[in-house]
């Protein structure tokens, strides 16, 4: 069935309160916060909510909702300034999951690595193929940060090496490392759902016995790897820099992404004391920082 969407322009100070009011008083089925100006916002730390200065609040209702009544309730709440901007539109019903699946195609990284949705045919059976079902965790290869890390891994000789995927998400980087020759790979993530998705995808690729996954508090003491990849975000890359550097063996290699071009030099400076940093690689405003740890 079709849906009705009401979009309200708010600020980061009142967006959450407005969202609560829409759910509790107007019967909204869901509420979403979007940036009104496409300004990057960074992943909040646990327990923290971080929104844009100019935020659109999108509320979804069923097609029978009384929009005049809803708008009168919104105005009566006095949460928005007089003359606030809003938009009401009807959305056609779609099979969103099917549409997403139809638009997720096999992708090639470097000379020999393919990331293939599990429901698609493999384009090149002789290549290094990672079959992926993202499930509940982020990481399909479509985002520039994932692509930058995959291309970096593909460029290395991983034969017989140990790799840590710090912030493993769906396990795409960890599984790619195994397929590219790594002997052992460890995935670390703060989200238990990510660990489940990583193990499920590893099983799908026949490499589950080469992948161990841990929550940070459960990882073995003294964990070290020849290669570490951390596709997270700038804030945790800064805050966890000592931990991440400590995972890299002497003469080992590290790559990081989830960093915008405006943040790259600052993040890199947190690692220069222990690593020789390579030239920063940029793709669509996102960057990869890589380097080798001093011996």
Swiss-Prot record:
InterPro entries for the chain: Ribosomal_L11_MeTrfase_PrmA, Ribosomal_PrmA_MeTrfase, SAM-dependent_MTases_sf
Residues involved in S-adenosyl-L-methionine binding: 146, 167, 189, 231
Annotated catalysed reactions: L-lysyl-[protein] + 3 S-adenosyl-L-methionine = N(6),N(6),N(6)-trimethyl-L-lysyl-[protein] + 3 S-adenosyl-L-homocysteine + 3 H(+)
Protein localization: Cytoplasm
The protein's role, per its UniProt record: Methylates ribosomal protein L11.
Family: Belongs to the methyltransferase superfamily. PrmA family.
Protein name: Ribosomal protein L11 methyltransferase
Any one cellular-component term (Gene Ontology): cytosol
Top-level EC class: transferase
E.C. number(s) listed in UniProt: 2.1.1.-
PANTHER family per record: ELECTRON TRANSFER FLAVOPROTEIN BETA SUBUNIT LYSINE METHYLTRANSFERASE
Segments passing through the bilayer: none
UniProt KW keywords: Cytoplasm, Methyltransferase, S-adenosyl-L-methionine, Transferase
């Amino acid at each position: 069935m079709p849906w009705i969407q009401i979009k309200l322009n708010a600020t980061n100070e009142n967006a959450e309160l407005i969202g609560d009011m829409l759910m509790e008083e107007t019967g909204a089925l869901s509420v979403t916060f979007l940036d009104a100006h496409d300004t990057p916002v960074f992943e909040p730390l646990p327990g923290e909510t971080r929104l844009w200065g100019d935020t659109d609040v999108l509320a979804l209702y069923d097609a029978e909702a009384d929009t005049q009544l809803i708008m009168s309730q919104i105005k009566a709440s006095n949460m928005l300034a007089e003359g606030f901007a809003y938009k009401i539109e009807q959305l056609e019903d779609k099979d969103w999951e099917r549409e997403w699946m139809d638009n997720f195609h096999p992708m090639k990284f470097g000379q020999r690595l393919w990331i293939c949705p599990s429901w698609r045919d493999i384009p090149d059976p002789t290549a290094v193929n990672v079959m992926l079902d993202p499930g509940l965790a982020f990481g399909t290869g479509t985002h520039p940060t994932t692509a930058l890390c995959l291309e970096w891994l593909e460029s290395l000789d991983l034969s017989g090496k140990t790799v840590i995927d710090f912030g493993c998400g769906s396990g795409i980087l960890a599984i790619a490392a195994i397929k590219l020759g790594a002997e052992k790979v460890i995935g670390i993530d703060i989200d238990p759902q990510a660990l489940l998705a990583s193990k499920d995808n590893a099983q799908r690729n026949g490499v589950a016995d080469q992948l161990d996954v841990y929550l940070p508090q459960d990882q073995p003491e003294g964990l070290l790897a020849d290669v570490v990849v951390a596709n997270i975000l700038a804030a945790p890359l800064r805050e966890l820099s000592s931990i991440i550097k400590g995972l890299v063996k002497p003469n080992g290699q590290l790559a990081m992404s989830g960093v915008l071009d405006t943040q790259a030099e600052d993040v890199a400076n947190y690692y220069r004391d222990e690593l020789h940093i390579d030239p920063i690689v940029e793709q669509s405003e996102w960057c990869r920082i890589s380097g080798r740890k001093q011996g």
